[in-house]
Amino acid sequence: MAIHLYKTSTPSTRNRAVDSQVKSNPRNNLIYGQHHCGKGRNARGIITAGHRGGGHKRLYRKIDFRRNEKDIYGRIVTIEYDPNRNAYICLIHYGDGEKRYILHPRGAIIGDTIVSGTEVPIKMGNALPLTDMPLGTAIHNIEITRGKGGQLARAAGAVAKLIAKEGKSATLKLPSGEVRLISKNCSATVGQVGNVGVNQKSLGRAGSKRWLGKRPVVRGVVMNPVDHPHGGGEGRAPIGRKKPTTPWGYPALGRRSRKRNKYSDNLILRRRSK
C-alpha cells in the first residue's frame, strides 16, 4: 500500500496521510444495501455502543470466507476497496463461471491464480485444511468451526502462525499473541492479509472521521454528574474516585471483561499479550 501525502495548503491536509485507495466498482450480484437504524442503540433506544452514527452510505460486499469452491482454479480479476473493512478485497473468476470476493492476500496481483481444496500447493491465497499445512506456515481467515467460514485473522495486515500439530488439534499463534488450539480439519488461507500499512494512515481532520460513522469521544471528567460518575466539581477536578468507572458505574480500564467458564478456556494455552 502506498501512503499519499497532501501538499501543506491547509492544516487539515498538512496532517493528512491516506492510502492511495484502489477504486471500487462492485458487481451488482455481490452487493446488497444495509439499513443502519439506531446507530449504537438497542431496541429501547438506549446507547449501548458509543461514538457511532452518521457516516457515508455503504453497500455491503458479500465476501467468501468459506472458500468452498473446491479444486476449481480461480483468477484474480480486480483488487477493490471495501468501505466495510480495512483490508482490500479481490474479485475472483472461477473456471466454472462462479464469481466471488475474497480478502486480498498480501502480494497478490491481478492475474494470479488461487485454488482451495485438500491437496493444493502451499501458495499465497490458496485455502486448505490445517492438517495439510507444514509447521511455520503463515495463515489468515482461519475457521473456528469446520465449514462455518473464516473468523480469525481477517483484518488488514493480520497473520497467524501454525506452530504445532498434535492429535486432532493444531496450535496457532494469533495476531494478538494468544496461543490456542483449533481442530486440524478447519481450513485457513495461506499468507497475510494485504494493506499492511493501514496503521500509517492519518485522517488529518474530524470530518474524515465522521465520514466513517465515528462520532466524537467525550471524556467523562468534563461531563456533569448526571451524565457520568467522573463528572462535576469546580474547574478541572479529578474523578473523585479510587478507580475509573464506566458511565454506568462498572470498573473500567483494566478489569477483565471475558466471560467466566467459557467453553474455549480449555483451548487457550496462553492469553493474548496486552
UniProtKB/Swiss-Prot annotation:
Presence of keyword Ribosomal protein: yes
> Cystine bridges: which residues?
none
GO BP of this protein: mitochondrial translation
What molecular functions are annotated in GO for this chain?
Answer: rRNA binding; structural constituent of ribosome; transferase activity
- Where is it mainly found? plastid
Q: State the GO CC annotations.
A: chloroplast; mitochondrial large ribosomal subunit
Compartments it resides in: Plastid, Chloroplast
Q: Where is this region: Disordered?
A: 224-274
Q: Organism's domain of life?
A: Eukaryota
Record's Gene3D superfamilies?
2.30.30.30, Nucleic acid-binding proteins, Ribosomal protein L2, domain 3
Query: What are the UniProt keywords, alphabetically?
Result: Chloroplast, Plastid, Ribonucleoprotein, Ribosomal protein
One Pfam entry name:
Ribosomal_L2
Q: Which InterPro entries match?
A: NA-bd_OB-fold, Rib_uL2_dom2, Ribosomal_uL2, Ribosomal_uL2_bac/org-type, Ribosomal_uL2_C, Ribosomal_uL2_CS, Ribosomal_uL2_dom3, Ribosomal_uL2_RNA-bd_dom
Assembly, in brief, is: Part of the 50S ribosomal subunit.
NCBIfam families according to UniProt: rplB_bact (TIGR01171)
Family, per the entry?
A: Belongs to the universal ribosomal protein uL2 family.
State what protein this is by name.
Large ribosomal subunit protein uL2cz/uL2cy
Q: What organism is the protein native to? A: Panax ginseng (Korean ginseng)
